């Protein structure tokens, strides 16, 4: 029988080695909501603005609950945990209603950037989206956010301007080979307010 809600995907666990020790990568769990306050406290205002495309300092408790309680049929998030068990970063994908595309996001603790954690989180997200049958990943990035554009560009994403919003670019990664007939980008998601953190 078909389960209405997928069970926790234990098979999606990875470990990455860094000079300071091993970081665990795994799907997010509801209990990870307890790790969010300390995590967000160590994300700078500028990194918060670049992530949410708007200045936001305080997140109510319900945001952490929403971010950690997922319907795995539609959404997936991966966390990276430091050797001490602290939250180091989160990557996330939300599938479009047709499940052909997914909108991704990434946030890494400011003091831990530059160590390959963001790249590792994006790679496992790409691996998951491909295995889940999505055709492409898409994400809006501020035009000034060269670091994020460089990261996803290195992973194979194309970067295209958004004609009616010069402050933002669209990054797209096709997950199927061209001979598989991958559809064109930009068709899966309705336009949403780029200041709404719940949609990113």
What residues fall within each predicted segment?
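Long, contiguous binding/interaction regions
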Residues: 1-200
């Amino acid at each position: 029988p078909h389960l209405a809600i997928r069970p926790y995907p234990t098979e999606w666990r990875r470990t990455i080695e860094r000079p300071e020790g091993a970081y665990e990568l795994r799907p997010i769990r509801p209990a990870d909501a307890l790790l969010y306050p300390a995590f967000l406290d160590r994300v700078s205002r500028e990194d918060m603005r670049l992530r949410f495309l708007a200045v936001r300092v305080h997140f109510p408790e319900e945001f952490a609950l929403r971010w950690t309680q997922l319907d795995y049929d539609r959404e997936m998030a991966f966390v990276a945990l430091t050797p001490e068990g602290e939250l180091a970063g989160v990557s996330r994908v939300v599938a479009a209603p047709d499940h052909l595309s997914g909108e991704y996001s990434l946030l890494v603790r400011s003091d831990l950037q530059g160590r390959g954690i963001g790249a590792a989180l994006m790679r496992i997200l790409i691996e998951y989206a491909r295995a889940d049958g999505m055709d492409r990943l898409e994400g809006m990035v501020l035009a000034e956010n060269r670091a994020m554009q460089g990261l996803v560009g290195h992973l194979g994403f194309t970067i295209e301007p958004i004609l009616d919003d010069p402050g933002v670019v669209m990054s797209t990664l096709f997950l199927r080979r061209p001979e598989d007939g991958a559809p064109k980008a930009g068709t899966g998601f309705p336009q949403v307010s780029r200041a709404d953190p719940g949609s990113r």
